[in-house]
């Protein structure tokens, strides 16, 4: 019992001098643990008389409590210092220049769609839209596509039900426009379309812009002039254009439109398959059967129509060789535009 006071003072001195929590815990174990020096004083109580034990035990417990209180206070002080040091190290310098947020850009297909629309609306075309799920009449019958036509086959068309499909073109919007408006009509119909196809140059979903002009005395010369002027405006160059006879059930006569290869200048390369030309769009004069289905007098009015594959134009404009890249959401690819 003689050294209890000395042990207590020694413990308090060590507590006051320690600078870290690990050292503080070591002091606690050394003095107050099961084998600690102050705790060991309790073993000496057996050598005292019964009258002396209560007073001696009380002194030992008081010493333990005193040391424990100092340890708790020192621990709180060290933890506060640690928090203050951490806050100081992590403080924000408000005078530093801020980081600019990353700003997104328009998708190349969206850019191309907007460019096409701007070219046509600048010369008086309206923009019309329609549903992407179409009935048989608007997607096929009204466009002179009979029941035996191969375009109706399951391997070409996504059927929602026996009488409804995901539209295979935006031509149904033209049908709805002719049924709801009186000529003259001058409209483009942009939108998503769907076909059962997927490879380097085809995807199950893609975008089209179809155009329609219905008025008196509209001729194939008007169609050629419209297409030629559009392509020159889109590519911002005097690109050579050629028309080839073709077949579409909803136009007569019909034509495929080619432009001189933008990669080789007509010399022949891998992109144009050594022909020097690239197929770019289809067009023709509206078939009288289509006018009949839409309630337009084919004796009084004629019409021109054309269809543009938006991704096809985007590939040529931006030099993209795989159509599927447009739909993979690859930021490294999209950030180039």
Swiss-Prot record:
Keywords: Aminoacyl-tRNA synthetase, ATP-binding, Cytoplasm, Ligase, Magnesium, Metal-binding, Nucleotide-binding, Protein biosynthesis. It catalyses: tRNA(Phe) + L-phenylalanine + ATP = L-phenylalanyl-tRNA(Phe) + AMP + diphosphate + H(+). The lineage of its organism: Bacteria, Pseudomonadati, Pseudomonadota, Gammaproteobacteria, Cellvibrionales. It is found in: Cytoplasm. The keyword Transcription does not apply. It is an enzyme of class 6 (ligase). The gene is pheS. HAMAP family: Phe_tRNA_synth_alpha1. Pfam families: Phe_tRNA-synt_N (PF02912), tRNA-synt_2d (PF01409). Mg(2+) binds at residue 252. This is Phenylalanine--tRNA ligase alpha subunit.
